[in-house]
């Protein structure tokens, strides 16, 4: 079946005057930028998609400040952005309340073979690590959406680099979008503009093709809420990994529209990494310097709401320690010529969850967004300041009038929320006071430790070290976290989130684990793998560990293990835990070490049974035998544990 949306132009199917004229005699003016200077294959991509989506004009972005000022002025005039007058160049955006988050149920991988994308799950079991759609079905979905979808709107051409422009680990993308909000956010989140096009001409021309539309051609058929066009009923976010292509329709929200982020930097990048021998992971990267002046680099993978950004920007409570951030969300990692694992942060900004962020929980994040930042779905005070849950004690006037994220009057103490729980700040990473001087080093920084973790209210000790690289992969595959459950459930439940990658898997998870195992073979010098749990609770539901800046005490122990100190750990069935007295607890009141580090036999036996069921249901026959052996061996070790 021929799919109109996926058909390609030949070089003579279009011509350029001061406009793009396609072979079907559609004339589309280029209102900014020099179309002729684009590489020919980029011209072809832009022309064929312009023919498909029928924009009224083409705008080639250069990433300059003048361009940003022009777009911001337009957005303010239309009411899309509201200036937060208490700051320099900070703006607030309120979205349609139906378009506020990533939409996992509408996110797809498109491959000819289903099990390239998802695992062989038993009949009747829905895979939770990715969704597959056939190319034929996808073609129909595209043709039901994209033809003519940009009518009456400008199509922006965004050339961008994930990673420093021209770097050995960096990759280029070009996003076509009809949203100027997306342009402004991509300018913060990626390296964007003319330098990318110059690099593209040098690097044999490879780029990831990204197509995004809000899905509301003009004249719009439905009412636009908050000046935010979207089409939630027809939203789709789809990836064609073999073709290095992303299609997104109907949503303007960051994770669905800033296609360099999760779509490219994780789902597509992990496919490129599989082909080229590297890894794309949902991990922070931080540099930690000891009082002796020794610096090591750590990568850490936590599910959402487990403190990744807080750890990346940690303010140590122990004198002499220093933490500097490379990245807070995504790591691209490749083994270097010396055998060590090197990581870059492919992003250029922070796209952080606002609620809960405060000077108490993360002062460095707060310092990062005092200017040049776009806030989405937070509240605004009458004084022109941002506000969200967690800032109640930082407001100068607690009785100040506010407008909440829905555009309604609001005051502290009201039952409704001031900010949406998934409200965001989009801020330049370079504004963070503790950004590492090497954060843009093209070859990356050497990783000594990989840390997994999640919210585990019971049973799981504060920290343990895996027994080996393969056991560490097993530990990562077992990551679970307490999450506020979906609407059809009540209360909270602990949910699986393997490697903190469950929502972002770009191919079969069994193959993903085998990729990790393959990369761990000699001559590669693999980092040590650890698991942390800041969130263990006592019987009366109080946290056993203070967390935040005191987490440096655990990082200290981890780094001493990386230095080869064998005297500070003791072996347990699940890995190596700190010997009593080897974590610095000075100044901490009433830490119940025994409860914090205990490994309850009954809990862990039950956990292994549940994990086995999870692997059987969600990984099935794709589970590597080595991981099955780790599960079996750990179960036997736990059985031998004395009560």
UniProtKB/Swiss-Prot annotation:
Q: What is its EC number?
A: 4.1.1.32
Membrane listed as a keyword = no
- Entry GO MF terms: GTP binding; manganese ion binding; phosphoenolpyruvate carboxykinase (GTP) activity
Identify which cofactors the protein needs according to its UniProt entry: Mn(2+)
UniProt cross-references to InterPro entries, sorted A to Z? PEP_carboxykin_GTP_CS, PEP_carboxykinase_C, PEP_carboxykinase_GTP, PEP_carboxykinase_GTP_C, PEP_carboxykinase_GTP_N, PEP_carboxykinase_N
Q: Which SUPFAM superfamilies match?
A: PEP carboxykinase N-terminal domain, PEP carboxykinase-like
Where does the chain bind substrate? 102, 253-255, 304, 422-424
* Binding locations of Mn(2+): 262, 282, 329
Q: How is the cofactor bound?
A: Binds 1 Mn(2+) ion per subunit.
Q: Which Pfam families match?
A: PEPCK_GTP, PEPCK_N
Keyword Coiled coil present in the record's keywords: the answer is no
Reactions catalysed: oxaloacetate + GTP = phosphoenolpyruvate + GDP + CO2
Keyword list, A-Z: Decarboxylase, GTP-binding, Lyase, Manganese, Metal-binding, Nucleotide-binding
Q: Which residues bind GTP?
A: 305-310, 424, 455, 548-551
What are the BP-aspect GO terms? cellular response to glucose stimulus; gluconeogenesis; glycerol biosynthetic process from pyruvate; oxaloacetate metabolic process; propionate catabolic process; response to lipid; response to starvation
GO CC annotation: cytosol
Residues of the active site are 306
Entries under PANTHER family matching the protein: PHOSPHOENOLPYRUVATE CARBOXYKINASE, PHOSPHOENOLPYRUVATE CARBOXYKINASE [GTP]-RELATED
Q: What does this protein do?
A: In parasitic nematodes PEPCK carboxylates phosphoenolpyruvate to oxaloacetate thus introducing the products of glycolysis to mitochondrial metabolism. Catalyzes the conversion of oxaloacetate (OAA) to phosphoenolpyruvate (PEP), the rate-limiting step in the metabolic pathway that produces glucose from lactate and other precursors derived from the citric acid cycle.
In the record, the note on similarity to other proteins reads:
Belongs to the phosphoenolpyruvate carboxykinase [GTP] family.
Tell me the subunit arrangement: Monomer.
User: What name does the UniProt record give this protein?
Assistant: Phosphoenolpyruvate carboxykinase [GTP]
Give the lineage.
Answer: Eukaryota, Metazoa, Ecdysozoa, Nematoda, Chromadorea
As recorded in Swiss-Prot or TrEMBL, the protein's gene is named PEPCK
